[in-house]
Amino acid sequence: MQGMTPKPKKGSEAFDIENRKRIFEYIKSHPGKHLREIQRKLDIPLGTLEYHLRYLVELELIVEKEDGHYRRYYPQGTIGSKDKKILSMLNQPIPRKILMFLLLHPNANFKEIAKNFSESPSTISFHVDKLLKSELIKKEKLGREMLYSVVDEQSVAKMLITYKQSFLDSLVESFVETWSELHP
């Protein structure tokens, strides 16, 4: 096959297989992470990681998806495109917090959203716009107010619950507990 990543030399084969297995297992349990996140978590040199990611993509064990400035990695065939879009946003701290806030406070106006964050209103506005463009949240006009809510609450909540360990965020743990109490 032309363009395939060359086979590793005999002496490094065991090391390569072990690294590849670690990378694949990490992506399976933490879908949607980007290159640098994977590199930091697994402590594998960047060049080595890129080599193995290309290899796993070419073998169609994982898929790579462009997300703005990032390439995110997912296990092949296990996550649909809608869920990839959700995970892409949930892997970013501010959009994740906005989504969790809106799941617990549907139909909130921008002021209510912004006052619950330490980031500037312009930063929150940027991320709200990003979530609107990705169609994960919607806005509706009620009188003079614009109200925001999550389009598919069940899917977003399911992704948060399913992959909560991959976010390393105590707010996600709190959210999962609260959501589970409200939606038994």
Locations of regions flagged by a protein language model:
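Long, low-complexity, charge-rich intrinsically disordered regions
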Residues: 1-18, 22-29, 37, 44, ...
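Acidic/histidine-enriched, beta-strand-rich ligand/metal-binding domains
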Residues: 94-95, 116
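A short acidic, leucine-rich amphipathic alpha-helix
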Residues: 37-41, 112-116
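Short hinge/loop at the helix->beta-strand junction immediately C-terminal to the helix-turn-helix recognition helix
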Residues: 60-61, 136
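Short amphipathic alpha-helical boundary/capping segments
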Residues: 8-15, 83-91
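Short, charge-rich, low-complexity alpha-helical interaction segments
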Residues: 63-71
